[in-house]
Amino acid sequence: MTATPAAPQGALLPNPAKERLLAGETVLGMNVRVIRSGDIARIAKTTGHDFIFIDMQHSLYTVETIGHIAQVALAIGVTPMVRVRGVDDPDTSVLLDNGVTGIVFPDVNSAAEAKRAVDRCRYPPVGRRSVGGGYPMFDYRPTPLVDAVAALDSAVLTVCMIETREGLENVEAIAAVDRVDVLHVGSNDLLAALGLPGQFGCPQHLAALDRVIAAAKAHGKIAGVGGDRNLARQVEFIRKGMRFVTTNSEIAFMLAEGGRVTSELRKALA
């Protein structure tokens, strides 16, 4: 009987979405709110998505369920990202220890909050993430901690959402925080905060997006956007410089196609 092989020295943990962003590409993500199996990662891949955006903030997902979905996503080359409940969400560390390679922090309003987000994602001396062991990302192979920590730190993608007046006013300072990777505009909440709920594509919305893009470029970060599901506007946002884009949710995709099919059949039966 042979011993379990150790992970190779200098073990690497892939994050396909991060790798594409570093190569100057645009990545597309599917919002996930209701499907509770790893099959959603496979569907996301088949439909051309680079990452899944698991919404812990607005859903009933447990940490265990997210871990199972994330580990399937990792195995098939889709980046598993989770929107947690805030910059101080204590579940951030356990998610990262169990398959998740990107964290989306909602309602980031200041540089201090952005730094707290980084602290949750990064190991010392950069951050305050606790060092564990026996990581599923390495198939539980014995891995020297120095290699595991380096690989996990390199793979993580830290996303700060800009979705309040305060966050927008401080976006340049947020962008300047070291190890923040993406500034992601939450269009729904931002427009609500501006007193313009649902007015996607209005001048104030477009001006906010331009400001975030400019701040990201000035500090070597990635600009992203979600919430506005109009395809024509999404194309324009990408052309302007948005490179981390959520397309729509699995709920919306199922409703759209399911509704289309039943509508056509009802017409045929009329």
Segments predicted by a language model, with ranges:
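Alpha-helix-loop-beta-strand connector modules within alpha/beta enzyme cores
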Residues: 16, 63-97, 121-127, 150-153, ...
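C-terminal helical cap(s) of enzyme catalytic domains, especially alpha/beta-barrels
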Residues: 69, 111-127, 251-270
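Catalytic cores of alpha/beta
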Residues: 42, 82, 87-101, 105, ...
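N-terminal amphipathic alpha-helix/helix-capping segment at the start of soluble metabolic enzymes
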Residues: 1-31, 142-154, 210-218
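Short, well-ordered coil/turn segments that N-cap beta-strands
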Residues: 23-28, 49-50, 74-80, 100-101, ...
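Active-site mouth loops of central-metabolism enzymes
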Residues: 21-38, 80-85, 156-169, 222-228
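Glycine-rich, proline-tolerant flexible connector loops at the mouths of alpha/beta enzymes
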Residues: 40-41, 45-67, 187-203
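Conserved anion-binding
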Residues: 90, 102-178, 189
